[in-house]
Amino acid sequence: MIELAPDQLPPLARWFAAGAPGPAALAEHVPASGTGSWWADRAHAPRALAVACAGQVLLRGDPSALAPDALAVFDAHYVQAPTCFLPALRSAFDRIVPWERMLYVHQLPVAAPCPPRGVTVRRLVPGDAPALAALAPDAAWLHASWGGPAGLAASGLGWAAFQEDEVLAVACTYFRGSAYEDIACHTDPAHRRRRLALACVTALCQDIAGRGHTPSWTCSRDNRPSRLLAWVAGFRLVHEYVHYLTGQPARCGAVPGSPAAHPAAAVRPGDTKASPGGTPRWRGRDSVR
């Protein structure tokens, strides 16, 4: 596939439904935020279209229009696509691993828990970028959809629990759509089980509702802590789906110019890739315990 410039994009309404919850909001988030990239089988009158951001990909169109290795640019990504794309994915990579996912929508208002003494929950501001950057490296996925710590801090769409200048927990809009905002949260492992994530998520949900939008939440079926937090925060299950973690290109080696070559795709907001032994581990948007 070839990468499209913003002025080369076809009308998106026929490709992606507007106002959809969960990862479908990615297609609206990319043009609004300026992060991510668009790909097609050809620039003029494309038959297959992909949008990628922060290690996630949405595929639409006619897979028969793709060359056998056309999707190899999306190695080490989480791909959501109609089942008709599975043969094309299998031919492009040495393996694809299905992940069962659960999509929740916020339905019940929840009272915010009182933060512990010395902890303040507030909206992120541009000056908080250094504090976000100081989070552990395995939390870098949190701001990938905003192009980095500065992008998330300046977006005005994140809430964090602070102890002095240290970020203990963060909840933020990950993909912002026209009706739904798919959210993510992370708590420093040393500060889990203090209800900090719940405090941040509750504040974020109130903020999103104030914009006239609805929060959504996605996580792995196997991640009970994430599912429990979603339930306690007032989210309810509305849909289950599968996305696919891609392996290495079938022809081996990273594809030059692929999204995986960029820092934003270095960590992925899903369950994480399979470990070297082949056993998947939790990580990314599920690291909310």
Feature names for model-found ranges:
Residues 65-69, 193-207, 228, 232:
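Conserved acetyl-CoA-binding loop-helix of GNAT-fold acetyltransferases
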Residues 21-34, 138-162:
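Active-site rim helix/loop that mediates acceptor-substrate recognition in acyltransferases
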Residues 147-188:
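A conserved beta-strand-loop-helix scaffold within acyl/acetyltransferase catalytic domains
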Residues 1-23, 109-146, 257, 271:
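Short amphipathic alpha-helix that is part of the acyltransferase structural core
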Residues 74-83, 208-220:
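Conserved GNAT acetyl-CoA-binding A-motif
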Residues 86-96, 198, 221-239:
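Conserved active-site alpha-helix within GNAT-family acetyltransferase domains
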Residues 180, 185-199, 222:
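Conserved glycine-rich acetyl-CoA-binding loop
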Residues 24, 33-128, 244-245:
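Acyl-donor-binding surface of acyltransferase catalytic domains
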